[in-house]
A protein has these predicted regions:
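Metallocofactor- and cofactor-centric catalytic cores in central/energy metabolism, strongly enriched
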Residues: 1-189
Length: 189
């Protein structure tokens, strides 16, 4: 849906908060922080970081209430992006990340969701809403998601999503089985 409204949008980049410093090191693009969890910046990419909304950081250009994103766009044009299509895998090695199902998106499909529940095409909803932690051995959310039946939907919020949002879980009743409803500070769907 976002790609229809914003054809220049190329995708979501990055995994969990604890990987920022490594992941942002070499990307030829600006990074715009819209919610929490900004890590101390490394000098190698600090000039490519922008903040907006509730996020700010010393020495970083903040996009204020006027929502003038021209500095971010100018930086993107200056850096040029990757010269070829580049696959950056998720935490589980996946290549597709489903995201962006905040209340507006969910409500726009409310009738379909309710109908699917009434018809039994969706039997249960699971909520995964905790922190993922930094150790690779912390796989509880990943393992849990893999065990959920195919006629269920997983709602994610907070950083726990990064442990499973690239898993190929398919759809239930034509809807993605993983619906990410936001971060811990903006998940009110």
């Amino acid at each position: 849906e976002l790609k229809k409204r914003f054809p220049h949008l190329k995708g979501n980049f990055g995994t969990a908060w604890q990987n920022q410093q490594r992941e942002f090191e070499d990307i030829p693009a600006p990074v715009l922080f819209t919610t929490n969890c900004i890590m101390p910046l490394r000098p190698s990419y600090a000039d490519r970081v922008f903040t907006t909304s509730v996020v700010s950081y010393p020495g970083v250009t903040h996009i204020g209430e006027d929502r003038d994103f021209s500095p971010v766009i100018a930086k993107a044009l200056e850096l040029g992006g990757y010269p070829e299509d580049t696959l950056i895998p998720g935490m589980n090695g996946g290549s597709v990340v489903a995201t962006g199902f905040a209340h507006h998106a969910v409500l726009s499909h409310a009738e379909e969701i309710v109908q699917a529940v009434h018809e039994g095409a969706i039997r249960h909803f699971f909520l995964i809403g905790g922190c993922d932690g930094t150790r690779p051995s912390r796989r509880y959310y990943t393992d849990f998601a893999k065990l959920t039946p195919p006629d269920t939907v997983i709602l994610t919020l907070a950083c726990g999503k990064f442990r499973l949002n690239d898993l190929p879980l398919g759809t239930a009743a034509g809807l993605p089985r993983i619906l990410d409803v936001g971060q811990c500070n903006d998940a009110y769907s």
